[in-house]
Amino acid sequence: IDIKFLEDEIKLINSLNVKGIACLGLGTEVNKLSFKEKVKIIELISKYKSKNTYLTITISGEKYTDQLKLIKVANANKADWLVLQPPAKKKLNDRECLDFFNSIIKNVSNNTFVGVQNAPEYLKSSLSPNSILKLYKNYKTFRYIKGEGTAKILAPIIKSYPKDLKVFNGRAGLEIIESLKIGCEGIMPSVEFSDKLNEIY
């Protein structure tokens, strides 16, 4: 990875006065990184981000133990929010997916908010709205969802959630206005045009 480029990118994001920085969430790219590279990216962002900017780290890994290793690194770097992804290669049914996330969330610090990336259109495994609500009821720290869908798809799902279960849309900022209108708390866009998306927000 290009350390200098990443440092410059973080400083650029700081200059935009955004609310937070998220990393390791682009599945097509993050799965090409080694564990050491993931750790380095987390450390760089933790070091260079603005003091009052939230740090969100996506946790991926095929095995329970892989994700726990990365969670320890995230906790050591004072992540505010962890976004858990289901395994990328293996397709899990709703029950298996819920069990997987249950086993992970039990081991997350009580000082760290946690959510899941729920993207049925993009990931092999996802949770039903009912399973999302089970996690919400079981864990006081489970208060966020990173959705990946059109505003039309997300609208009825958001309506079924409690008001303090916040949904952020992804998809690089597509449909930002529509996403905000249906009740998304915000979006998690790509960096390239975050300045314009921040103005729209």
Identify the meaning behind each predicted range.
Residues 105, 109-112, 119-201:
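Catalytic alpha/beta core domains of metabolic enzymes, predominantly
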